């Protein structure tokens, strides 16, 4: 389509030139030469302006580099204001305040030297990216904001983040299939398949309480959950939140949840929560009141105005009977998962899990060993496997046989208060 039009245009110009006289052609040529000369002068002037602008930019960058020399003064954004200068301001006077005529956002900040500064010119940071509470680095003399700084957290909270993911798997846990399913439904599925809950219109639980006798696999289950999800894992211990100074424990809880929001999706695991979650009572001792304040801060973070659905809490305890009812109610730790003593079938499975990397004789009967370990928990069954291996090592054997396991049961049972019948 375009080729015939080009041919028509060129033929029209040829016809026009053919109809023009020689003087007209010379005049048109001079006009074109003048236009070309003017355009060349404009291009040359534009290039010179570009060079001068580049020089100015380079000078300004050098000045900025000089002004941005470390160290900075640290400050906090207190308030962000919108400047609207009056329209009827005097324009012909000599004493016009230029700062009062500026439009845009201004900042009130508080420095680490306890000075409150109003900045009509923000500095080198985009004002739209700032919000109250942000930590910024400012110039020591002009107080202009030079850079934004990362949020400040307690160093103890930063140490709670588990950088190396645990290596445990659900296959390392024996006899707790029902508990694994409940934990996956409450913690893992809302993070990996959130759309399934939205389709049903169901709000997933905020937290899970794992309770049961010692050695039944509560902490092991939390470690396996951390290994199976891509979420950040924060591990807190209940005694770690009990601090000497007033308000210190509550600040740790607050900083932990704030860090979890920035790292979301995140799982917070609080082991031995009975250290801070005991029932409240009237006490004149300041230490007891401080523990209660720490628990109240935990309750506020669980269901306060600042709660976040991308943060899940797993709490573990072996004394669920002494926990405060406010902590146990629905909406906070919604799902309670009990970890009972393992059954006979579960004990056989646990013994097989802990001995799968050992060189075990084929004649070892794990079902018979499970019948001999009535009332043993998971930790004691692991101790049985370790003792059996040590006994085989003591007699220079290359395999662990059934008698070694029986001797291991005897040694572990001797350390228990209750007497057990270890023969089937």
Curated annotation (Swiss-Prot):
Superkingdom of origin: Eukaryota
Positions of post-translational Phosphoserine modification: 19
Covalent crosslink: Glycyl lysine isopeptide (Lys-Gly) (interchain with G-Cter in ubiquitin): 235, 279, 416
Positions annotated to bind ATP: 212-219
Pfam family, one: Prot_ATP_ID_OB_C
Protein's cellular compartments: Cytoplasm; Nucleus
A cellular-component GO term for this protein: nucleus
Subcellular location, principal: cytoplasm
An example molecular function term from Gene Ontology annotations: ATP hydrolysis activity
Keywords: ATP-binding, Cytoplasm, Isopeptide bond, Nucleotide-binding, Nucleus, Phosphoprotein, Proteasome, Ubl conjugation
Similarity comment: Belongs to the AAA ATPase family.
Described purpose of this protein according to its UniProt entry: The 26S proteasome is involved in the ATP-dependent degradation of ubiquitinated proteins. The regulatory (or ATPase) complex confers ATP dependency and substrate specificity to the 26S complex.
PANTHER family documented for this protein: 26S PROTEASOME REGULATORY SUBUNIT (PTHR23073)
The protein's name: 26S proteasome regulatory subunit 6A homolog
Gene name in the database record: TBP1
């Amino acid at each position: 389509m375009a080729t015939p039009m080009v041919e028509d245009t060129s033929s029209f110009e040829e016809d026009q030139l053919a109809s023009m006289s020689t003087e007209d052609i010379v005049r048109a040529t001079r006009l074109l030469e003048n236009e070309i000369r003017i355009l060349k002068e404009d291009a040359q002037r534009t290039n010179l302006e570009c060079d001068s602008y580049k020089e100015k930019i380079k000078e300004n960058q050098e000045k900025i580099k000089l002004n941005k020399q470390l160290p900075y003064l640290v400050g906090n954004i207190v308030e962000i204001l919108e400047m609207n200068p009056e329209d009827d301001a005097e324009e012909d006077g000599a004493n016009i305040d230029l700062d009062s005529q500026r439009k845009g956002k201004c900042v009130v900040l508080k420095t680490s030297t306890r000075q409150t500064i109003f900045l009509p010119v923000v500095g080198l940071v985009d004002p739209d990216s700032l919000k109250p509470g942000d930590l910024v680095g400012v110039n020591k003399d002009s107080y202009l904001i030079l850079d934004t700084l990362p949020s400040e957290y307690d160093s103890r909270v930063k140490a709670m983040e588990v950088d190396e993911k645990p290596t445990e798997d659900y296959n390392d846990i024996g006899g707790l299939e029902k508990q694994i399913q409940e934990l996956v439904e409450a913690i893992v599925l809302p993070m990996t398949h959130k759309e399934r809950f939205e389709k049903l219109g169901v709000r997933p639980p905020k937290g899970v309480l794992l309770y049961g006798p010692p050695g039944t696999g509560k902490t092991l289950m939390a470690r396996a959950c951390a290994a199976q999800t891509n979420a950040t894992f924060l591990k807190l211990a209940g005694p770690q939140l009990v601090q000497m100074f007033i308000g210190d424990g509550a600040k740790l809880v607050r900083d932990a949840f704030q860090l979890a929001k920035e790292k979301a999706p995140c799982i917070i695991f609080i082991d031995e929560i009975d250290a801070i979650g005991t029932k409240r009572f009237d006490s004149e001792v300041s230490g007891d009141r401080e523990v209660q304040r720490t628990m109240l801060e935990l309750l506020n973070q669980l269901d306060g105005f600042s709660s976040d659905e991308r943060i899940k809490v797993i709490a573990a305890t072996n004394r669920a009977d002494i926990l405060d009812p406010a902590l146990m109610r629905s909406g906070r730790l919604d799902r309670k998962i009990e970890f009972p003593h393992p059954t006979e079938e579960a004990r056989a499975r646990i013994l097989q899990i802990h001995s799968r990397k050992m060189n075990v004789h084929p004649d070892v009967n794990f079902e018979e060993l499970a019948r001999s370990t009535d009332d043993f928990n998971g930790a004691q069954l692991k101790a049985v496997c370790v003792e059996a291996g040590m006994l085989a090592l003591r007699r220079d054997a290359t395999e662990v046989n059934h008698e070694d396991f029986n001797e291991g049961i005897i040694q572990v049972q001797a350390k228990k208060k209750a007497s057990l019948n270890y023969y089937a």
